[in-house]
């Protein structure tokens, strides 16, 4: 991997951060914002169809750029900005990471930076959120646009910024990065390892952050998405994009995993011990009255109040290997638990389970919806679990009424795109081209 990342941005202007004595800075601690420091809400899988979630999460389908490009989503978090600012968005933070950030900010030898892939349009709301928590980073960095209108991919932008930090702060000998996206964690590790080959004193640590997803209130989310579709449809004709409509009561049958299981898969992928998994689940869960005082349950996101659903008895699987497919799905190799003594799955001589075979489940990172197959299977990265690491995974079959987003009228695109267009850098209606011609 090359250490030089040319994205057409020139050099970063650190002078706007105020005076910093570069001779005193020995370490840099870089914090990601979304789902790392702050638990940004995701589209609720219990409300939307799979197609609707795909439309909302994509950056280049809706004219406003989708869920993570619309400042209204952050503004709608909890009970809204006016209420949440007074209570510092309580309950929406990863408090362990907040504590680490406070320590980084306190130390005079550390450059503490908040680095996000969001653009400058989010500066107002993001700075309001972190200020309410009393987090005074030396720098809050948003993705920049090149003079020619080019928007770099978030990963390349962050790597470019790392280089700029090392160029300006010459005495840094240690880097610590807090990040939640698996592909970024892997790329940062490879890039920093390559840097360490040329500079033996360039130590680094990457903290993989894994927290259960959080969601907006049902009525807030419905109103928000309706507004996003209205805004899109006003701009769509001039951008030659299709019009979309909100559709209610779509019957669907889906296979899902509970939120707690989604959290477990994520932590297992990042090699976080089981004890820490359960501690993290406990810290981010709502306790319900139970005969077992030690029983902790993660509350599932709320369902539409005016629609019904029913859940079939779940199926149990013995997880033998895990991996990922891009930043979209966790991949799970599993054996049906029927026929095995589940209490003995950790014993090597008893649980003779083929770890490289069995059923492959694709579990959506953001929603927990399970698919049985994906077209391009070459993008998987597998980690075989030792017997002591195996666990019993439950999947549920649910028939429900959900909401959907569909074409407002028949639409035939004049251009043909493949599923690889997202990673190939197709233009975003909001941000313009993501790669140079």
Swiss-Prot record:
The entry's keywords: Phosphoprotein
Chain positions with Phosphothreonine modification: 296
Protein name, per record: Uncharacterized protein C4.02c
Biological process annotations from GO: box C/D sno(s)RNA 3'-end processing; rRNA methylation; snoRNA guided rRNA 2'-O-methylation
Superkingdom: Eukaryota
Lineage, uppermost ranks: Eukaryota, Fungi, Dikarya, Ascomycota, Taphrinomycotina
GO MF entries: histone H2AQ104 methyltransferase activity; RNA binding; rRNA methyltransferase activity
One cellular component (GO) term of this entry: nucleus
Sites of Phosphoserine modification: 290, 293, 418, 428
A Pfam family of this chain: HAD_SAK_1
Disulfide bonds: none
């Amino acid at each position: 991997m090359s250490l030089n990342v040319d994205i057409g941005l020139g050099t970063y202007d650190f002078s706007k951060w105020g005076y910093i004595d570069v001779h005193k800075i020995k370490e840099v601690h870089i914090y990601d914002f979304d789902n790392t420091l702050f638990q940004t809400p995701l589209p609720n899988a219990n409300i939307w169809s799979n197609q609707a979630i795909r439309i909302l999460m994509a950056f280049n389908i809706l004219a406003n750029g989708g869920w993570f490009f619309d400042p209204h989503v952050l503004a709608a978090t909890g009970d809204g900005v006016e209420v949440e600012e007074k209570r510092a968005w309580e309950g929406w933070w990863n408090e362990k990471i907040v504590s680490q950030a406070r320590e980084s900010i306190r130390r005079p030898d550390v450059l503490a930076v908040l680095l996000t892939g969001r653009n400058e349009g989010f500066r107002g709301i993001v700075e309001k959120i972190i200020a309410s928590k009393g987090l005074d980073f030396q720098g809050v960095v948003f993705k920049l646009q090149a003079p020619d209108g080019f928007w770099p991919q978030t990963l390349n932008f962050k790597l470019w910024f790392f280089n700029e930090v090392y160029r300006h702060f010459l005495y840094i000998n240690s880097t610590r990065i807090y990040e939640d996206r698996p592909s970024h964690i892997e790329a940062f590790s490879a890039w920093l390892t390559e840097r360490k080959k040329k500079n033996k004193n360039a130590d680094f640590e990457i903290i993989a952050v894994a927290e259960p997803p959080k969601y907006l209130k049902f009525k807030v989310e419905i109103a928000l998405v309706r507004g996003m579709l209205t805004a899109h449809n006003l701009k769509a004709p001039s951008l030659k994009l299709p019009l979309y409509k909100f559709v209610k009561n779509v019957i669907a049958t889906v296979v899902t995993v509970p939120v707690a299981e989604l959290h477990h898969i994520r932590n297992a992928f990042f090699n976080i011990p089981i004890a820490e998994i359960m501690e993290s689940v406990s810290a981010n869960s709502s306790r319900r009255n139970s005969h077992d005082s030690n029983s902790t349950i993660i509350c599932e996101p709320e369902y539409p109040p005016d629609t019904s659903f029913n859940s079939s008895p779940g199926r149990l699987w013995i997880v033998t290997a895990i991996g990922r497919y891009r930043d979209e799905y966790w991949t799970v190799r599993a054996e049906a638990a029927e026929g095995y003594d589940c209490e003995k799955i950790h014993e090597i001589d008893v649980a003779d389970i083929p770890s490289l075979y069995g059923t492959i489940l694709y579990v959506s990172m953001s929603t927990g919806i399970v698919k049985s197959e994906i077209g391009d299977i070459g993008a998987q990265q597998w980690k075989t679990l030792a017997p002591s690491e195996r666990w019993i995974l439950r999947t549920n079959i649910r028939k429900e009424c959900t909401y959907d987003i569909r074409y407002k009228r028949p639409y035939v695109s004049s251009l043909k795109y493949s599923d690889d267009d997202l990673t190939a850098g197709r233009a975003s209606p909001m941000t313009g081209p993501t790669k140079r011609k």
